[in-house]
Amino acid sequence: MIEFRNVTKTYDTGTKAVKNANFVIDKGEFAFLVGSSGSGKSTLIKLILKEEEPTSGNIIINGKDTTFLKQSRVPYLRRSMGVAFQDFRLLPDKTVYDNVAYAMYIVRATPRHIRRQVPMVLSLVGLSGKAKMYPNELSGGEQQRVALARALVNNPSMLIADEPTGNLDPDTAWDIMNLLNDINMRGTTVVVATHAKDIVD
């Protein structure tokens, strides 16, 4: 599903964010990218999403070498992935329902499909009763659940979560990790970038 072959990323400043990375994440796995702040975790995610290009090496996603993928094909690559960011990136003027539905509008899903899929994924993340609320009315853990719901709503084969527990208290952090485990048990490949080694252990 994801394979890095001798991948190096060096920025124009000379900073080597990733050096000779070699790893494989198979379909259905739950994988962690672990390291302190500035260790290259976010760069790895950007490379997977093709937001950054490797300086050298090859990146294979779902059996396709993305190294020379045309820019016009990148949106199609990303449709196989759901991404939840540390800062949530929720739309403040839209309800929970509309924040999640927005990801479906972008891929031109039918209104009927949206009406069916959004309540289903909100139920999965435990937010059925919060659909009409706005982000500023939610706790940090609830906002993270909205971000996860939005990442999952288009049924991606892979979920990438960048520091999903970074802004949360310990109890809420474990709730989110349990949710990610449940998502993985349903067959979705899960990749979590984190600095919290206790969560990995």
What feature does the model see in each segment?
Residues 49:
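Helix-to-loop junction immediately C-terminal to a conserved catalytic motif
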Residues 57-65:
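Conserved ABC transporter NBD signature motif
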Residues 153-157:
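A short, proline-enriched helix->beta-strand linker immediately N-terminal to the Walker B motif
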Residues 159-162:
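Catalytic Walker B motif of ABC-type/P-loop ATPase nucleotide-binding domains
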Residues 94-101:
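Short coil-to-helix segment of the ABC ATPase nucleotide-binding domain corresponding to the Q-loop/switch region
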Residues 148:
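Hydrophobic anchor residue at the start of the ABC signature
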Residues 133-138, 142-144:
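Conserved ABC ATPase signature
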